[in-house]
Amino acid sequence: MSKGTSIKEALSKWEEKNSEKAAEAKEVKLYQMLPPIEKMDASLSTLTVCEKLSLSTNCIEKIANLNGLKNLKILSLGRNNIKNLNGLEAVGDSLEELWISYNSIEKLKGIHVLKKLKVLLMSNNQVKDWGEFNKLQELPVLMELVFVGNPLEEKHSAEGDWQDRVTKSLKALKKLDGTPIIKNDEEEED
């Protein structure tokens, strides 16, 4: 099997293509690298100015080496092989959006560090139970959630009580699976 592209190589390609230093860029796109990126290595820490980092459509298994990305607001990791959310601590104080659809995440342990997270795009993962889902209650400003395609959502959508159960659990939520949440006045008063 061929060796994957390193972050350092990907950043070099990006700089060549964009005629800009990655370390000075607010948005860095390292998606769909050929061969794919397999590891989030220490070279990421050079992206101190970066506000939006895209690493989607690669073969990354673990979230790592985000220390140094003090300004990161949007992290895109969709379509990888990520199994858990460990490794987000370094961006806990800045990250506002996490795009992590089409991975293999079953457990939401580690998400609680994202105190500024407003948007979580997490469709097509493997979350199966409410115990895991309810860890999202630890995100005080979460307003938009996409969770379609997880076993938990599929089961409860089929039973017809998905939106109801989610809005009872996540009271600040404004949008679920692309649909605005309309609350009636009685719910607003609790």
UniProtKB/Swiss-Prot annotation:
LRR repeats by residue range: 49-70, 71-92, 94-115, 116-137
List the coiled-coil residues. Answer: none
Q: Name one GO cellular component term.
A: microtubule
Keyword Repeat assigned to the entry: answer is yes
PROSITE patterns per UniProt: LRR
SUPFAM superfamilies, per this entry?
A: L domain-like (SSF52058)
- Subcellular localization: Cytoplasm, Cytoskeleton, Cilium axoneme
A single GO BP term for this record reads:
outer dynein arm assembly
> Which positions form S-S bridges?
none
> InterPro entries of this UniProt entry?
Leu-rich_rpt, Leu-rich_rpt_4, LRR_dom_sf
**Per its database record, what is this protein's job?**
Part of the multisubunit axonemal ATPase complexes that generate the force for cilia motility and govern beat frequency. Component of the outer arm dynein (ODA). May be involved in a mechanosensory feedback mechanism controlling ODA activity based on external conformational cues by tethering the outer arm dynein heavy chain (DNAH5) to the microtubule within the axoneme.
Subunit composition and interactions: Interacts with DNAH5, a outer arm dynein heavy chain. Interacts with tubulin located within the A-tubule of the outer doublets in a ATP-independent manner.
Give the free-text miscellaneous remark of the entry.
Outer (ODAs) and inner (IDAs) dynein arms contain the molecular motors that generate the force to move cilia by ATP-dependent reactions. There are two mechanosensory systems that monitor and respond to the mechanical state (curvature) of the axoneme. One system involves the central pair microtubule complex and radial spokes and the second system involves the outer dynein arms.
Please give the name of this protein.
Dynein axonemal light chain 1
- From which source organism is this entry? Ciona intestinalis
